Regions:
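Surface-exposed repetitive/solenoidal architectures
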Residues: 1-33, 41-44, 52
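Feature responds to low-complexity, polar/acidic, surface-exposed segments characteristic
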Residues: 31-69, 76-96, 102-131, 144-156, ...
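C-terminal/domain-terminus segments
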Residues: 158-165
Length: 172
C-alpha cells in the first residue's frame, strides 16, 4: 500500500464529510500539500461504494490502486482524460479540475447544476473548458476566491482547500 492509498483509508460517510477517505487527515498533517486527481476520484468512489468498473481505456491507469475509482468515474461521466489518452492520476488537481469533477458528480447524482455566478470581478479567469464548472462551484459557494479579486482556478488545490470544499459539497 503506498502513502496515497493509506491516506485514503477510512470509514467516511456523507454524514461525516471530513472522514471521506480521511479528508480531514489529509488537511491535518499536510494542509498545504497538493491533492492528486487519483485521490479525488477515489474519495468519490468510496462515497458511492464502488467495487468494480469496466476499463475506461486510460493508458496510465491499468492495475494501480486507484484504477477502479478512475474507471468508474470515467464511465459515468464524472471525469475525462487528456487528449493523449491518459488520466494523469498522480498530477496535482487544480481548483478548476476539482470544480468540474464535483459538478459532473453532482449531475451524475441527479442534482441541479444550473446555478452560475458572475466571475468577471476576478482578475484571473478559468480555462474555457472549466468556465461553467467554476461558475457553478462559486454560485454554490463550494469554491471561493483566494483573495477578493483572485480565484486562481489553475492553481493546485491544497489538501486544506479540498477538505473544506468537500465538506461544503457534502453538506448540501
Amino acid at each position: 500500500m503506498n502513502s496515497e492509498e493509506s491516506e485514503l483509508k477510512g470509514t467516511g460517510t456523507a454524514e461525516d464529510p471530513y472522514q471521506i477517505g480521511s479528508a480531514a487527515a489529509l488537511a491535518e498533517f499536510a494542509p498545504e500539500a497538493t491533492t492528486t486527481r487519483a485521490m479525488i476520484v477515489s474519495m468519490l468512489a468510496r462515497l458511492e461504494g464502488v467495487e468494480s468498473a469496466n476499463n475506461a481505456g486510460f493508458a496510465d491507469v491499468s492495475n494501480e490502486w486507484y484504477a477502479t475509482a478512475v474507471n468508474w468515474a470515467a464511465n459515468v461521466g464524472v471525469v475525462n482524460g487528456y487528449e493523449d489518452g491518459t488520466f494523469q492520476p498522480n498530477t496535482a488537481i487544480t481548483r478548476e479540475q476539482l470544480a468540474a469533477i464535483l459538478m459532473n458528480y453532482a449531475a451524475y447524482k441527479g442534482e441541479d447544476v444550473s446555478a452560475r455566478a458572475d466571475l468577471s470581478s476576478y482578475t484571473n479567469q478559468p480555462s474555457t473548458w472549466a468556465e461553467e464548472a467554476m461558475q457553478w462551484a462559486v454560485a454554490e459557494e463550494l469554491i471561493t476566491g483566494v483573495t477578493n479579486d483572485e480565484l486562481q482556478p489553475q492553481s493546485s488545490a491544497t489538501r486544506a482547500q479540498v477538505a473544506a470544499i468537500l465538506q461544503r459539497f457534502l453538506a448540501e
